[in-house]
Amino acid sequence: MHRWLFVMLALLPGLGLADERVKVCYGYGCLVQADVRYSDGQLGDVRRLLFAAVDAAEERKMLALAIGRLYAWAGEQSDIHNDRGGNYADGGIPGKMDCIDHSTSTTRLLGLLAERGYLRWHRVREIEARSFAWLIPSHWSAVIEEKTEGEAPRFVVDSWFVDNGQPAVILPLDEWKKGAGPDV
């Protein structure tokens, strides 16, 4: 009986949330996918950051920082540490990311945070595109939606605008669709 109890107590720490793996795209159009591992310690840091938020607006501010940190840690394990904001500053370096890479990877990172219960005021939505002259899709971004009654406001979480490891740009979806965002 005591041996069984000892074995159960020894296994107890392993019953918590384990390290997580996420595929991060790069090379333009998700040509390359790196398997990135986030430790319990790193995810605990992100959890504490997000749980410091007192409302949805504050959660978006913390989420911008969290996405930047997650990309920085991914850059320690892959070539994406070379990625620069926009497309023009990348040059021919390995690890460059276009908006398809960013929107796909950021949506995966947001999904990880949602699955762990770290997003209290937002839910993850599908990737959105904005178009040039209302015809040709020209830019894609990850999207979150505020958890509210009635018409829920949506926001883009756009890491494409910034260098690797910097806070993501979070804007109202409607403004982003009209071209809002840093000039890169």
Where is each model-derived feature located?
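Hydrophobic/aromatic-rich core segments of domains that either
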Residues: 111-176
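N-terminal, post-signal-peptide region of Sec/Tat-exported proteins
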Residues: 42-76
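Short N-terminal segments immediately surrounding and downstream of signal-peptide cleavage
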Residues: 19-35
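Second-shell loop/turn segments in exported
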Residues: 32-33, 49-60, 85-100
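Bacterial N-terminal signal peptides that target proteins for export
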Residues: 1-6
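N-terminal signal peptide c-region/cleavage motif recognized by signal peptidases
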Residues: 13-15
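Low-complexity, Gly/Ser/Thr/Pro-rich intrinsically disordered linker/tail segments
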Residues: 179-184
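Mid-length scaffold segments of soluble, non-membrane domains
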Residues: 67-122
